[in-house]
C-alpha cells in the first residue's frame, strides 16, 4: 500500500514538472508598432511556423526583419 502511494506521489511530481517546463517554454509575443515579433528567421519563409499558430484568432502574414539589434526576427502582421 505504501509503495502505491509513493508511486502516485512520484507520478504527480513528474507531471507537475512537465507542465511547468512546458509553460515556461512558450514563445512570448513582443509588440513593436504593428508587428508582433515572434521567433528568429533567415528569410520570410521561416516565419510561417511562428506566425501561423493554432491559438491565433486570425492568420498572420510573416516577414523577416534583419535590422533588429537582437538579430533577425519575424514580424507577424494580421491580414
Swiss-Prot record:
<keyword id="KW-0732">Signal</keyword>
<dbReference type="Pfam" id="PF25052">
    <property type="entry name" value="AtDEF-like"/>
</dbReference>
<keyword id="KW-0295">Fungicide</keyword>
<keyword id="KW-1015">Disulfide bond</keyword>
<feature type="disulfide bond">
    <location>
        <begin position="51"/>
        <end position="75"/>
    </location>
</feature>
<feature type="disulfide bond">
    <location>
        <begin position="41"/>
        <end position="64"/>
    </location>
</feature>
<feature type="disulfide bond">
    <location>
        <begin position="35"/>
        <end position="76"/>
    </location>
</feature>
<comment type="similarity">
    <text>Belongs to the DEFL family.</text>
</comment>
<keyword id="KW-0929">Antimicrobial</keyword>
<dbReference type="GO" id="GO:0031640">
    <property type="term" value="P:killing of cells of another organism"/>
</dbReference>
<dbReference type="InterPro" id="IPR010851">
    <property type="entry name" value="DEFL"/>
</dbReference>
<keyword id="KW-0611">Plant defense</keyword>
<dbReference type="GO" id="GO:0005576">
    <property type="term" value="C:extracellular region"/>
</dbReference>
<feature type="signal peptide">
    <location>
        <begin position="1"/>
        <end position="23"/>
    </location>
</feature>
<feature type="disulfide bond">
    <location>
        <begin position="47"/>
        <end position="74"/>
    </location>
</feature>
<keyword id="KW-0964">Secreted</keyword>
<protein>
    <recommendedName>
        <fullName>Putative defensin-like protein 274</fullName>
    </recommendedName>
</protein>
<dbReference type="GO" id="GO:0050832">
    <property type="term" value="P:defense response to fungus"/>
</dbReference>
